[in-house]
Amino acid sequence: MSQTTTNPHVAVLAFPFSTHAAPLLAVVRRLAAAAPHAVFSFFSTSQSNASIFHDSMHTMQCNIKSYDISDGVPEGYVFAGRPQEDIELFTRAAPESFRQGMVMAVAETGRPVSCLVADAFIWFAADMAAEMGLAWLPFWTAGPNSLSTHVYIDEIREKIGVSGIQGREDELLNFIPGMSKVRFRDLQEGIVFGNLNSLFSRMLHRMGQVLPKATAVFINSFEELDDSLTNDLKSKLKTYLNIGPFNLITPPPVVPNTTGCLQWLKERKPTSVVYISFGTVTTPPPAEVVALSEALEASRVPFIWSLRDKARVHLPEGFLEKTRGYGMVVPWAPQAEVLAHEAVGAFVTHCGWNSLWESVAGGVPLICRPFFGDQRLNGRMVEDVLEIGVRIEGGVFTKSGLMSCFDQILSQEKGKKLRENLRALRETADRAVGPKGSSTENFITLVDLVSKPKDV
């Protein structure tokens, strides 16, 4: 039976890999502030919780508490090095781990769980919510384009087949509303190519099938980004709530900058600097690190390159010395602040969803080199739909290809046009998160669903 309570207790089930848990916690913090009478129990692994709660504990609302659950790795287990091995171990143990965590939270708070909020990857939360008679509110951390491919996964497989796309890579996904410029090659692994039988692929397949059953799906985007996608997803899902972009609502906290990046930028001309970063997960293959280095050296564009220390071994001999006068290679950079600086004129990126919106916030055109997952879809959207950046020709870094991108964005009329499009997009996004904007109204709806549970 469904449950209504004046003392809401929201169980939040996180996916503790990549950058999934942090944006979910960001939403929970907003919800906790908007519904101070509710209690939010946040469940993730100890490693994940330590990384996302540590820096914000002094400002964390008192109605949020984290609970550590098992990572599913048996004691003494030796990893075999299989792709997504850690995800598989976690996923197998997760249903029972989350249940045990909720029992503990109920005992501590004295409140029964009244609502399940979960990362969409935790698809079995649908079954748990049904068993408990609760609303299930999955959070999609990426964009509406990738969400659509999962919701339509069975139709896509029926149309394209699952025996590979060789020779059909550039055919268009024009049978899915809002996806007419997407090519087969842009799809994520696990949709029609890759190991479709892996536990991770099967998990995402099942997720796409059950999302239409959710009480509401909420997402870090805004309705006006793509009317076609928005309207179609509204027709496929019970309730579809765009509540972002998050970085325009709650700017990331200012963190101490020990690398000197921001001071260095003060000495550079407007829109002259190339910023390079591929997120917290990805490093380009060694040959592409070399190609990027050669392009920077030959073009002599000022640059800041956020490169992990362990990847420095792939830099060409003498590169750091030769570029010292106009470039910085640092192990980490305050990305949002760097992209917001007027000196930055281009962003070489993997095209992750969060990085994309930090670039939009700063008005910086993107040079996209996608690697996996939704990144290819995002790159296509950046170049062909939104027209706020370019993709690397051929999909891999080459010296000549990069130099051409630098020239287009920093020196040619195209760069000016991209920046104009970015300004217009930023203005539209700002309206969405404004007092009467669509994202603001949708967030009010989400608060109502979370704090005043109704029939599921």
From Swiss-Prot:
Task: Copy out the induction comment.
Answer: By light.
Record-listed UDP binding positions:
19, 280, 306, 332-333, 350, 354-355, 358
Sorted UniProt keywords: Glycosyltransferase, Transferase
Q: Which residues bind UDP-alpha-D-glucose?
A: 19, 141, 280, 306, 332-333, 350, 353-355, 358, 374-375
**InterPro entries per the UniProt record, alphabetical:** UDP_glucos_trans, UDP_glycos_trans_CS
**Annotated positions binding quercetin:** 18, 84, 150, 188, 373
**CDD domains from the xrefs?**
GT1_Gtf-like
Pathway note: Pigment biosynthesis; anthocyanin biosynthesis
Outcome of residue 289 to L? Answer: In strain: cv. Flame Muscat, cv. Italia, cv. Muscat of Alexandria, cv. Pinot noir, cv. Pinot noir /PN40024, cv. Red Globe and cv. Ruby Okuyama
What Pfam families does the database record attribute to this sequence?
UDPGT (PF00201)
Provide the free-text tissue specificity comment from this protein's UniProt record.
Answer: Detected only in berry skin.
Q: What PANTHER family does the record point to? A: GLUCOSYL/GLUCURONOSYL TRANSFERASES (PTHR11926), UDP-GLYCOSYLTRANSFERASE 74E1-RELATED (PTHR11926:SF1560)
Question: What's its job?
Answer: In the presence of other necessary color factors, this glycosylation reaction allows the accumulation of anthocyanin pigments. Involved in the formation of red wine pigments. UDP-glucose (UDP-Glc) is the physiological sugar donor, and cyanidin is the natural acceptor in vivo. Can glucosylate the anthocyanidins delphinidin, peonidin, pelargonidin and malvidin. The flavonols quercitin and kaempferol can also be glucosylated in vitro, but with glucosylation rates 50-100 times lower than cyanidin.
Task: Quote the protein name from its UniProt record.
Answer: Anthocyanidin 3-O-glucosyltransferase UFGT
The organism named in the record is Vitis vinifera (Grape)
From the broadest rank down, the organism's phylogenetic lineage runs:
Eukaryota, Viridiplantae, Streptophyta, Embryophyta, Tracheophyta
